[in-house]
Regions:
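Short consensus segments that form the blades of beta-propeller domains
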Residues: 56-60
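DnaQ-like (DEDDh/DEDDy) 3′-5′ exonuclease domain used for proofreading
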Residues: 2-53
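Sparse, context-dependent recognition of short Cys/His-centered cofactor- or disulfide-binding micro-motifs
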Residues: 53-55, 105
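Active-site-proximal helix-loop-helix substrate-binding element of RNase H-like nuclease domains
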Residues: 1-23, 63-66, 70-172
């Protein structure tokens, strides 16, 4: 994206009605420039109601991405794109993500990369950089762990957990 396109995107985002979210969290007002970061983490929130019964919905076009969490350096962002209220403009968010992910010099970190990459590809986003998957790496570090989910790993290795109150209020 050019700087003019980013400026227009910022204005579009500022014009969005965020809705009433009972939380300290609010969606970002701008899309960050992550060009200076070598490693970027991405986690998708999806609505995939038939996942347990039929497998990932991305291959059947059954379900959709509802939000995109991105972290780089000490910063993190969440971009709601298909919640009930408070969404950011979908097209510019996915255009930004497409531009970001086509950078072959970057490393992208996922948890359960196969699942998230399937959803990204279904949205037309191809990740061209190196891919690292914490779900694959975790048992290599400790094969005797009881749980390998992202929340357990983040708690044990980073001392942080999901903010359930914030997640519930953002999802409403």
């Amino acid at each position: 994206m050019t700087s003019d396109q980013y400026h227009l995107l910022e204005q579009d985002i500022k014009d969005v009605a965020w809705g009433n979210i009972d939380s300290d969290w609010t969606p970002p007002e701008t899309i960050p420039d992550l060009s200076q970061y070598d490693t970027i983490s991405i986690d998708l929130e999806t609505r995939d109601e038939n996942l347990l019964k039929l497998g990932p919905g991305w291959c059947r076009k059954d379900g959709h991405i509802i939000g995109i969490a991105v972290a780089a350096g000490e910063s993190s962002w969440y971009f709601p794109v298909a919640h009930t209220v408070g969404n950011m403009p979908r097209r510019p968010v996915f255009q930004w993500l497409t531009d970001l992910c086509k950078d072959t010099t970057k490393t992208f970190v996922f948890h359960n990369a196969l699942y998230d990459l399937g959803w990204l590809r279904a949205e037309g986003v191809e990740v061209k950089g190196k891919i690292r998957d914490t779900m694959v790496a975790a048992p290599l570090l400790n094969e005797n762990r009881r749980y390998y989910n992202l929340n357990s790993l983040a708690g044990d290795y980073l001392g942080t957990y999901k903010d359930e109150k914030m997640l519930k209020s953002a999802a409403e």
